[in-house]
């Protein structure tokens, strides 16, 4: 159409196309194809299949990237179960892959988690533990945040092409994304109270794995870490380098949690434009099942709501399977569903 609209110089067909927005492709192909991505977070409510999805994503990424690392920050450490292989705090090659590595960390273990028996030998040490706990409470989250900071420093030095985070349930995830702010705030608070806690600072540093140092040395170490932390923080807020994939199931509580998570991610300025809806029931017309049909109707209601609410998201629909996805071969098979929409029996 050659004519513009009412002198605005805009083609009429642009307006004609506007009302009917095509739904975005229901796959994670956009993630695989965006080669600028460095950090990919996979998270959501507990029990929705985050680990299976994050491991599957890592497998697909390994087919096109030079080196891929998947990190579990969930104390449950389910990636060992998913790949049927024991992983540790050190990146370990996943069996059957040359460029896929996995590691598990538990950043939530701080001084407060140490058993009382550790301090029984000396009353002074026992008192020291209480003092350390009081000191740590002055800047909550600093031990967990410093653990994240150390992991980030190590990971950045290893130069992986892309890092996938299999995150813990929502609360831990938001702390992970906010750790740069927590460390900066904690550093300021430490400078204010370092003279008060100086007698116990060496014990506290040993508990945090920071070696034997005084308050000034600890503050200096934190200041040295800040540039790395700030760099990571900037990357987290860059949609070209970082994105968050929400995993949920088609139920009210999970949908509510997903919306809350997306709102929090927006506040943190973290990009998110992909949702995986897992464990969907697709009735088999050749094998009628009242329970399956009832479940399918409930899920369909919430799926419709999600498609209305998140029309600017890629919504990936994954089926509930009759078996566990465990072992590298099964994870690899399941991972294909991230790129090729699942076809239920009734449509095959």
UniProtKB/Swiss-Prot annotation:
EC assignment: the record states 3.6.4.-
Any one of the GO BP annotations: tail-anchored membrane protein insertion into ER membrane
Name it: ATPase GET3
Active-site residue list: 74
* Subunit relationships: Homodimer. Component of the Golgi to ER traffic (GET) complex, which is composed of GET1/WRB, CAMLG/GET2 and GET3/TRC40. Within the complex, CAMLG and GET1 form a heterotetramer which is stabilized by phosphatidylinositol binding and which binds to the GET3 homodimer. Interacts with CAMLG (via N-terminus). GET3 shows a higher affinity for CAMLG than for GET1. Interacts with SERP1 and SEC61B. Interacts with GET4.
Q: Where in the cell is it found?
A: Cytoplasm; Endoplasmic reticulum; Nucleus, Nucleolus
Residues the record lists as N-acetylalanine modifications: 2
Function (record text): ATPase required for the post-translational delivery of tail-anchored (TA) proteins to the endoplasmic reticulum. Recognizes and selectively binds the transmembrane domain of TA proteins in the cytosol. This complex then targets to the endoplasmic reticulum by membrane-bound receptors GET1/WRB and CAMLG/GET2, where the tail-anchored protein is released for insertion. This process is regulated by ATP binding and hydrolysis. ATP binding drives the homodimer towards the closed dimer state, facilitating recognition of newly synthesized TA membrane proteins.
């Amino acid at each position: 159409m050659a004519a513009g609209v009412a002198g605005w110089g805009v083609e009429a067909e642009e307006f004609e196309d506007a009302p009917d927005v095509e739904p975005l492709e229901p796959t994670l192909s956009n993630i695989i194809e965006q080669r600028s991505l460095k950090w990919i977070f996979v998270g959501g409510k507990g029990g929705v299949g985050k680990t299976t999805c994050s491991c599957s994503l890592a497998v697909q990424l390994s087919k096109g990237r030079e080196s891929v690392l998947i990190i579990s920050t969930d104390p449950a450490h389910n990636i060992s179960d998913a790949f049927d292989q024991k992983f540790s705090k050190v990146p370990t090659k996943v069996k059957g892959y040359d460029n896929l590595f996995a590691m598990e960390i538990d950043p939530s273990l701080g001084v407060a988690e140490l058993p009382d028996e550790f301090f029984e030998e000396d009353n002074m040490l026992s008192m020291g533990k209480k003092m350390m706990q009081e000191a740590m409470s002055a800047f909550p989250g600093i031990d967990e945040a410093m653990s994240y900071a150390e992991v980030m420093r190590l990971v950045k030095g290893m130069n992986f092409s892309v890092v996938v985070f299999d995150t813990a349930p929502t609360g831990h995830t938001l702390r992970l994304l906010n750790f740069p702010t927590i460390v900066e705030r904690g550093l300021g608070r430490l400078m204010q109270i370092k003279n008060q806690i100086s007698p116990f600072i060496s014990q506290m540093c040993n508990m945090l794995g920071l070696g034997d140092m005084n308050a000034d040395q600890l503050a200096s170490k934190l200041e040295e870490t800040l540039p790395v932390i700030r760099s990571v923080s900037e990357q987290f807020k860059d949609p070209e380098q970082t994105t968050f994939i929400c995993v949920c199931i088609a139920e009210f509580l999970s949908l509510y949690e997903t919306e809350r998570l997306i709102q929090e991610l927006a506040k943190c300025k973290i990009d998110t434009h992909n949702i995986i809806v897992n464990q969907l029931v697709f009735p088999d017309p050749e094998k009628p099942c009242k329970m399956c049909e009832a479940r399918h109707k409930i899920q369909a209601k919430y799926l419709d709501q999600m498609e209305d609410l998140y029309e600017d998201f890629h919504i990936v629909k994954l089926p509930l399977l009759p078996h566990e996805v465990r072992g590298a071969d099964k994870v690899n098979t399941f991972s294909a569903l991230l790129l090729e929409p699942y076809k239920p029996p009734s449509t095959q």
